Amino acid sequence: MESGETLLKKLDGKLSGLRGRLTPDTGMDKITWFRAGGPAQVLFQPADEEDLSSFLKAVPEEVPILVVGIGSNLLVRDGGVPGFVVRLSAKGFGEVDQVSETQLRAGAATPDKRVAAAALEAGLAGFHFYHGIPGGMGGALRMNAGANGVETRERVVEVRALDRKGEVHVLSNADMGYAYRHSSASSDLIFTSVLFEGTPGEHEAIKQAMDEVQHHRETVQPVREKTGGSTFKNPEGTSAWKEIDKAGCRGLRVGGAQMSEMHCNFMINTGTATGLDLETLGETVRARVFENSGIRLHWEIKRLGLFREGEAVEEFLGKF
């Protein structure tokens, strides 16, 4: 992968009118919650939706563009991410506003917990589950994030997005094509904001529901570790953690990566993990679960980027 400076020079003049920040060769370990992985060739932090649209129109389609939010659900490989990584920041995409008696509009970089807090302030029930999800709205929309039996799709009215050419699209709930931890909306779309619908509720009842979510999370999840959240989706009819535990993988280590002793569907960086450590651990767990029960676990964490040149990659990687 060539340097970010080289890429910017090739596009000299095309990006001069942007108001956001362009930073070449930025370590993704500073962005992701795992604190591991190689660099983004160029990191772009747009000022707002208009600035992002201008950027998309200016960058040739053959140049890769990858969008990330607050980095909670990402595993970046050690060879880095070619092209541009777009990170939506709180300044331009992190606001949440009450737009009617029962509706909230949130930017794609708004932390899930901030949406829960705004709903509490507005007296709207149905958003308490976000209080326990370590992520942002963009990721929640893309993967239909959920917890405690509630999912994002239950609250979405419409989603605003930009396509690769910088054109605006407004998607209805049906357009998002939601399923368990999945949206079938085009992967080329960049979500910029969402309109939610809640139901009026009592402040104390909403607050109690949020407190219960927080207590549960702190009791059973390694919230103070470097982790990306749930590693694998729950298979039909069972829980990922149960299958991982039955396969003897609780506490399993590869290098500086470990399956949490506290919650074995959470992978943690104990301090020295590389992207390869983390991915190899995850694939080792998948292989052992398949061998033990015949169940194929599917990654919930998004893996991206290149393997480091010359890096020894285990033969089973990606087979399951």
UniProtKB/Swiss-Prot annotation:
Subcellular location: Cytoplasm
Reaction catalyzed: UDP-N-acetyl-alpha-D-muramate + NADP(+) = UDP-N-acetyl-3-O-(1-carboxyvinyl)-alpha-D-glucosamine + NADPH + H(+)
Gene3D superfamilies found in the cross-reference section: 3.30.465.10, UDP-N-acetylenolpyruvoylglucosamine reductase, C-terminal domain, Uridine Diphospho-n-acetylenolpyruvylglucosamine Reductase, domain 2
PROSITE patterns named among the record's database cross-references: FAD_PCMH
GO cellular component: cytosol
Pathway involvement of the protein, from the record: Cell wall biogenesis; peptidoglycan biosynthesis
Cell wall biogenesis/degradation found in the keyword field: yes
The entry's keywords: Cell cycle, Cell division, Cell shape, Cell wall biogenesis/degradation, Cytoplasm, FAD, Flavoprotein, NADP, Oxidoreductase, Peptidoglycan synthesis
Origin: domain of life: Bacteria
Enzyme Commission number(s) from the entry: 1.3.1.98
Cofactor: FAD
InterPro entries attached to this UniProt entry: FAD-bd_PCMH, FAD-bd_PCMH-like_sf, FAD-bd_PCMH_sub1, FAD-bd_PCMH_sub2, MurB, MurB_C, MurB_C_sf, Oxid_FAD_bind_N
BP GO annotations: cell division; cell wall organization; peptidoglycan biosynthetic process; regulation of cell shape
Active site positions: 181, 230, 300
Protein family according to the UniProt entry: Belongs to the MurB family.
PANTHER family tied to this protein: UDP-N-ACETYLENOLPYRUVOYLGLUCOSAMINE REDUCTASE
Function field: Cell wall formation.
Protein name in the entry: UDP-N-acetylenolpyruvoylglucosamine reductase
Lineage per the UniProt record: Bacteria, Pseudomonadati, Pseudomonadota, Alphaproteobacteria, Hyphomicrobiales
Gene encoding the protein: murB
